[in-house]
Every structure is written in structure tokens, then in C-alpha cells.
Swiss-Prot record:
Pfam families: FTHFS (PF01268). Pathway: One-carbon metabolism; tetrahydrofolate interconversion. SUPFAM superfamilies: P-loop containing nucleoside triphosphate hydrolases. ATP binds at T84, P85, L86, G87, E88, G89, K90, S91. One of its GO terms (molecular function) is formate-tetrahydrofolate ligase activity. It comes from the Bacteria. The lineage of its organism: Bacteria, Bacillati, Chloroflexota, Dehalococcoidia, Dehalococcoidales. Its EC number is 6.3.4.3. This is Formate--tetrahydrofolate ligase.
Amino acid sequence: MAVNDREFHLKELDPVLMKDWEIAEKAEDFLKPVKVLAMELGLTEDEIIPHGKYIAKVDFAGVLARLKDRPNGKYIDVTAITPTPLGEGKSTTTMGLVQGLGKLGKKVTGAIRQPSSGPTFNIKGSAAGGGLSQCLPLSPFSLGLTGDIDAVTNSHNLAMVALQARLQHEANNTDEFLSSRHLTRLDIDPSRVEMKWAMDFCAQSLREIIMGIGGKTDGYRMPSGFGISVSSEVMAILSVFTSLSDLRERMGKIIVAYRKNDEPVTTADLEVDGAMTALLLRAVNPNLLQTIEGQPVFVHAGPFANIAIGQSSIVADRLALKLADYHVTESGFGADIGFEKFWNIKCRLSGLKPDCAVIVVTARALKMHGGGPKVTPGAPLDPAYTTPNTKLVEKGCQNMLAHIQTVKTAGINPVVCINHFAADTHEEIDIIRRTAEQAEARVAVSHHWAKGGDGATELAEAVTDACNEPNNFHFLYPENMPLKKRIETIARKVYGANGVSYTPIAMEKLARIESMGDTQFMPTCMVKTHLSLSHDPALKGRPSGFTLPIRDILTYMGAGLVVPVAGDIKLMPGTSSDPNFKRIDVDTQTGKVKGLF
């Protein structure tokens, strides 16, 4: 379909009157076939593996080998202020910015994470964007895509199967019998199993379970539980690996438990790492989709930012930067967690340097941070959020200033994107603009939800200006900074804490990690709530004077991350009383899914 025809049809879509899934359904009638999209991007026919008409896997290794001497395009990260539980439109802004850069005639790509079934069927939705700034096709994107998260789940759970089988066989059999089966007794301490099972749903009743309650042949009885698949170390590995050989090596380093002599038990010790890698073989290549206006979007990996690394894959960004002049990637939640991990983990491991960071701001979130009433998903918004209130906005700007400071600490040029909502007033917008500009950030008001790329040209122009200015990108901490000092640096300089406290188990693990040589110098992946700069989701605005409580420290040797856990956050979220799955259904006449967003 010609560009003019596509634009004509887009003008018929009204996000005020239509739901996201209705817009997506209409827009999918004039998507580019993925082979056309790939050709426009500069991919050859043998570099794509089509999955239907509109989705393809891309052979990242082949493309990177072919384009190894081509310079990278401009690298842009989209982050946000601390959101309300409803989200502030970061994925929508990512799609809108990609479309806006397209309107300026730029060769542009985007990269976002694959949505987890947990939030898709729970509260937050599928993270495809919204209105006239979406990633399409919506139903496949939201409902498993090409099976990458399923592959991660199966790979992770295979390690647990191997561990459980080994515990059972060692408990039931003599050393002589084990030797006849070519097994050496590992003498695993069942009280020190580091892994749980994985499931890609929000299932709070599975956080803590007892397993193996049958007889001698029914497994090994022990406490266990489930985490959501996107919190798995295997998912983190999919985000950070750089080649198939790198992936294979990492899969053998995952620590699943400890022996009674305090030695770690790895997936390689269980001889399951090769099979785990085999399960991921088709998942290693990024997925190619498109915006509602036909720009290419890579979708790969799906870790949350509050309980995991929160980034799409390194290989997707490397691939896109060779193919486009501008590449827009997204990091999860606010700059305190998603951008901080993009900055100090993803960029450190990839060697890539960003040119600009976009901070998504809404008047709604600033009102919440300024002391507005509680925002509850599924409940009507308090009138404070839909009527003018400049005092709440002005007070809430302190949260925005904290995130601007975080981006500037990285030496990157910040662009504040005011994601415009219908209830916003000129006075509220002026306060946000003036405050951000006084903090030496560029500012753009964007209407991409309502107008698509046409509504994002001001943002796109601000981003290109920022990309063309020199920056002084640098990491928050050097690689050789001791772990305890590194945790305190993140807590003080990014979260605004006064200090850090540790539970006894966290102190014990800290001492063990610090005795493990280079392990303590692996990048630090903090786990904490996304609903506050602090560990406490009730503390809004720009809290100060608090101590960050570290309750546990996990070691992800395969991903190469040390993971301190702050506060009461869970690795398995819960399903709400009014989940999205109640509104999702299938039109039996057309076979199309309705109710997604």
C-alpha cells in the first residue's frame, strides 16, 4: 500500500472514540508485509525468518557480520519519571517518537521488550503503546509472539527438573549406584536452593509452595515456589548475551543451589546447560514488527525493570544501530531503575554509548507526586487528576527534577517529553516546561497518542538536536568499586537515600560475594519498587532522609549480575481483583482477539 493511502486510512482512526484493540484491528488492514519492511530496512531475504505475513525473526549474527564496518546510528533511550500504577505512556512515547522521526524523513528503528502474559492479563496491559502510536500486529505481539518467553520458561524449568531429579536420586541411592549411572554425588544442601520455578503469569499463591509430597518415587520433598518468567536469570541472559557462544557459556554458569560444603552447584554441574541452550536456539534472534505508521520495531527479551534488568536485548540494539540512522530503545519504568540499568549495565556490557535520553512526564503523575489522592488501577480517577491543579503539579515537579538529575549524572543530554493528556491545561504544561528548562533539559509537548507521528514532530526535533550535541557519557561507578560501596552509591546518588541497611541474610551473602574475587565486581542490578524513588511505594515525590533496606542479595553468575533486593518487593506479582483477562475474548465470526491494550 502506498504511503499516501496508509496516511489516508490512519486519519480515519480516532483514539478518543476507539479502543486500542479496535485501532489496531483497523490499522492491521494496511500493514506492510514483513518482507517489504525488511527490504526497506536493508535486510536481505536470507537474513529473515518469516513468522506469518507481518512478523519475522532476524538473523542478527549474519547481519552484524555483513555490516560490521558500518558506523552506528544515533542511540536514544526512553525512560520516565516515577509512574502512577497506570503507567505514563512510555511505550506509547517510544512508538510515537519512532513515528515522529519518520515524519522528519529519518531512517529510524525502535526496540521494546516482549510483553509478559502477567501484566497483559492482569492490570497494566501488553505494553504495545496506545492510541495512534502502537506496535503491531497487536494480538501476536501481546499473546506470545514467536514463543521467546515460552522458551525462556522451559529452559529455566528444565534446570529445576534437573535439580529435583538429582536431589531425589542422591537421597534414594548409594554412591555405587550413582557411579553406575555416571553420576558423582553433589551433596546438595536442600535448604540452599537458589532457584524457583518460572511461570509467565501473576500467581501470588505460587510464591511459596511445598513440593515432592508423594512417596519416595515422587520427587524430593522441600520448600520451593515460582517467580514470574521475566524475572528469571535465563531472561536476563537473553537480554545481555552478545553471541551464541557467549549465550552457551553463560548458560553453564547459573548457580541453582549450594553443596553442604558451601560450593556452588551450577547448571553445568547438573549437565543440563546444553539442553537449556538448545531450548533457546530460536529465541536468540530478535523479532521484527512495525509501528502503526510502518516503521520497523525490534521486539526481543522481556525482563521487568523493578525485579530484573528491564531492557530489551543488546543484540537487538546492536542490530538496529547498524541498520538505522536513529534507534530508539526503551528501558522499563522510571529513570531510577530502568535507565539506571540501561546506563550502568546494558551500556557497560554492550560497549554502546547513548546520545540522548527522553524522560516521559505527565501532569497526572506530577499531581500524584505533589500530594494528590491515591491512584488505583480499575477505580475512577479522583477529580484532582482531571481538573486544573497547578499547585499539585508544581510540587510534584520535584520528582521530575530527580530523574533529570539522574540522566545528567550519566553525562547524557536529557529531553523531557510532556505526554499530553486531554485534561492538561496550558498553565500546568507551562509549569512543567519552565521547571525542566531551568534544570537545563530540552522540553517538548507531544500529542502522539492522539495524532501519531504528526503529534510527535516537536519531540523528534528536540531529540535530533540533543543527539547532535556532544555529551560526556560515563558510568556511575567503576567496575572495581566494592559491592557494598556500589550499592550505597546507587542508593544515595540515584534514589536519594541517606544510607543502606542490611538484614542478617543479606550481610551473610554480601560477605560471601566479597570473598568470591571478581564476582563482587559484576554489574549491580537493583530490585526495588517502581512506584517510588525509595523502596517504599507509599513515598511519593522526591523522598529524602530514608535508609534503603537490603533484605537479600542474589548472584546471577550466568547473566553476570549481582542482584540486591530492597524492601518487600516480590519476584512473583499477584493478580488483581479486576484483571484484564475479564475483558479479553475472541470474535468467533472473524477469529480476531478483542479487548487487548
